[in-house]
Amino acid sequence: MKIMILGIDIGGANTKITEIEGDNYKIHHIYFPMWKKKDELEDLLKNYNDNVDYVALVMTAELADCYKTKKEGVEDIIDKVEKAFNCPVYVFDVNGNFLTSEEAKKNYLDVSASNWNATAKFVAEFIKDSCILVDMGSTTTDIIPIKDKEVLAEKTDLDRLMNNQLVYVGTLRTPVSFLANKIEFRGKLTNLSSEYFAITADISLILNKITEEDYTCDTPDGAGKDFESCLTRLVRVLCADREMVKDDELIDFANKLYNKLLELIRENVDTIAKRYNLNDVVITGLGEEILKDALDEYNIISIKETYGKDVSLATPSFAVAKLLQKQLDK
């Protein structure tokens, strides 16, 4: 009899679920802002609890501002997962181990923000034993060195930020003002507004790096996610409107901001590549097309091209389910 394993990745903005039974899998991607809806998490998960034998869990939502501490977040998330499923729950930690839910609560810092490590361990076991894993999601970009199947990354988000292994820039949710405070416009180096007018999703859509369907987060102004709405938001970063700035000028402006995004990713990956003498890169996440532009000088292996877009958009949930499946098969 085949075992049904549910891999769950609970992020601050998105929850991703992978159902794995033997070689068959199905992936669910749900926009679920925990800072607004954390009390509805149990009900959400109950929609996926049919015939589940094991749950493999990773999380980053414990960092959401609905929780005062990581301890509170980890405990609350695990409690809600346990209530939603009538089966064993295993939580993947930053050391590459599966913990019982009780062990995970006691060692809450070890399971905090552990989703990147599940992806890295999966890549090391199933794809490439020496490489840099670059996972660009909606909000952040993980840059993980792997050598001889060993994940060499720092363990906490703070240490990863300090060592070029975590960049707080993503395909969708990053405010444009994070990318630059000045951009050349009409021949002059021009100051930009730091108001929450536009996000990387607007640039990504304008430049055809994502589809409207991929734009899953809320828009800064509550308006649409179409090309015209994205241009309308972007022009506000110049404290202007569509009557003052032509569309071709705005597209050029978007390209200049996009190049700043590419530079930010490239300089961090370059640092890791030199530090660990690595030149193969495995890319995954919503931002794969952006990563291809940023890292065109590297040997690239795409999870999207290897496993499909669904897996690329939900790699940690797929990875943690595959890793538990492998462990149970031993």
Swiss-Prot record:
It catalyses: gamma-L-glutamyltyramine + [5-(aminomethyl)furan-3-yl]methyl diphosphate = (4-{4-[2-(gamma-L-glutamylamino)ethyl]phenoxymethyl}furan-2-yl)methanamine + diphosphate. Keywords: Transferase. InterPro entries: ATPase_NBD, Hydantoinase_A, MfnF, MfnF_synthase. SUPFAM superfamilies: Actin-like ATPase domain. Pathway: Cofactor biosynthesis; methanofuran biosynthesis. It is an enzyme of class 2 (transferase). One of its GO terms (molecular function) is transferase activity. Signal peptide: none annotated. It comes from the Archaea. Its EC number is 2.5.1.131. Catalyzes the condensation between 5-(aminomethyl)-3-furanmethanol diphosphate (F1-PP) and gamma-glutamyltyramine to produce APMF-Glu. Belongs to the MfnF family. NCBIfam families: MfnF, one_C_unchar_1. This is (4-{4-[2-(gamma-L-glutamylamino)ethyl]phenoxymethyl}furan-2-yl)methanamine synthase. It comes from Methanocaldococcus jannaschii (strain ATCC 43067 / DSM 2661 / JAL-1 / JCM 10045 / NBRC 100440) (Methanococcus jannaschii). The gene is mfnF.
